Amino acid sequence: VHFTLAFEGPNYRDPDIYTAQIYATAMGGGMSSRLFQEIRENRGLCYTIFAQAGAYEDTGMTTIYAGTSAEEIENLANVTIDEMKRAASDMSAAEVARARVQMKAGLLMGLESPSNRAERLARLLSIWDRIPSIEETIKRIDNVTTGDVREFAAHMAGHAGSAMALYGPASSAPSLDDLRTRLAA
């Protein structure tokens, strides 16, 4: 079963986009992330799980995706919501620091590819009408605090899922309304 939760997030001009990206990275940006460790490694509820934050001109979206079995979809969905709620109170400074390092490493490593560099320059020019320096971007990433990420996590929990998509045999999956109720509790 393919499972996706999506939440409205900041647009690309909103300074909170860096907070959203750090939140998504800490929650599901790799093997050391909270969702990967708790849901995949500790509980074995899925074979893949990740989170990401995307931004557009007038809105943004933070999504969580997991691939699981029909037998595990209900438990996976509920534990995902529980981890989102927990992040609002116990996202650690170490998790945020690790996410910051991961984002900066990705940014710097992306500069090694001419096509990535060209795409970055074009994207930044179209968004900002200028090209912010790497140092400016790194400073924005470094300025995001653990408190900022916890506040963003609380905001996500308080605005219970905008959308859910399921593909596959998911008859035992909780409804979006059930997940919203669990998130708001």
PLM regions: where:
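His/Glu-based metal-binding/catalytic segments typifying zinc-dependent metallopeptidases
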Residues: 1-34
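M16/MPP (pitrilysin/insulinase) zinc-metallopeptidase core fold and M16-derived inactive scaffolds
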Residues: 26-45, 56, 87
